[in-house]
Structures are given as C-alpha cells and as structure tokens.
Amino acid sequence: MRVKSLLCVFFLLLMAGGVFAQVQTGSAYPKREFRAAWIQSVNGQFRGMPTEKLKQNLIGQLNSLQKAGINAIIFQVRPEADALYASRLEPWSRFLTGVQGKAPEPYWDPMQFMIDECHKRGMEFHAWINPYRTKTTLKSELA
C-alpha cells in the first residue's frame, strides 16, 4: 500500500510540474543574429590608394558581405595610435595615407563614409580601436 501511495504522489507531482511548465515562444529569441565581419586596416591594403578607388573597394566589400548575410561591420578605425577618422586628438593613420599625421587628399572621413554606407544597407557599424598599440613595426615613424 505504501508503494502505491508513493507512486500516486510521484505521479501527481509529475503532472503538476507539467501544468506549470512554460512554453517557449518565438518572441523569447532575439529578432536576428549578430553576423559580423571585421574589416581591418593594418595590412596596408588601403595605403596610398586614391580616395575614389578606396571608396569603391570598401563599397564592393560591403556589397559582397551583405549578399553573404552579414548584418554588422566591425571596421578598424584606430590601428596604431592614429585614426581613420577626423580627430582633434589622434593623427591620421599611415595605413590610409602612407604617412602618419597626413590628412587624406581629397579630404574625407573613412569612418563616417563606412557608417553611411553600412546604414544604406541596413547593416550595423561598429568601430574597432586598438587602445594600446602604438606601432606594428620598429621602422615606422610616429607623427
């Protein structure tokens, strides 16, 4: 008799647990995934490239990444104590112009350009900075 009572209590507890279980709905999941690509600037692929050619290169990369399902771009804007954006505090990056501290000619702001182009495509823009690196090679001069 005792075994039957324990089984009944166990069965009732099991049933009660099912009544209070919560159903997972689709709204509990994020609206979308964060599918990001990182566009770095330290390998010199932009150095000395004419402005229009560089812009077209970046647009081409964004178009390809968008077609691949990427919805966020992480763009390296501060590679080595310099900037790929207009700044009162940091010199222009040598990875953009070839010489640290030299503004691009014709003048443009690569970070603002990327923000605008990402948003045109419905992509998020995230600025990547290297807060500690000052140089990638001993041969380069700082501004």
Give the location of each predicted region.
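Bacterial N-terminal signal peptides that target proteins for export
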Residues: M1-L7
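Boundary at the C-terminal end of the N-terminal hydrophobic targeting segment
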Residues: V19-V23
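Catalytic domains of carbohydrate-active enzymes, especially glycoside hydrolases
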Residues: Q56-A83
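Bacterial N-terminal signal peptides
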Residues: C8-G18
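Aromatic- and acidic-residue-enriched segments that line the glycan-binding/catalytic groove
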Residues: A83-G98, R133-A143
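The substrate-binding groove and active-site-proximal loops of carbohydrate-active enzymes
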Residues: V42-E52, W92-W108
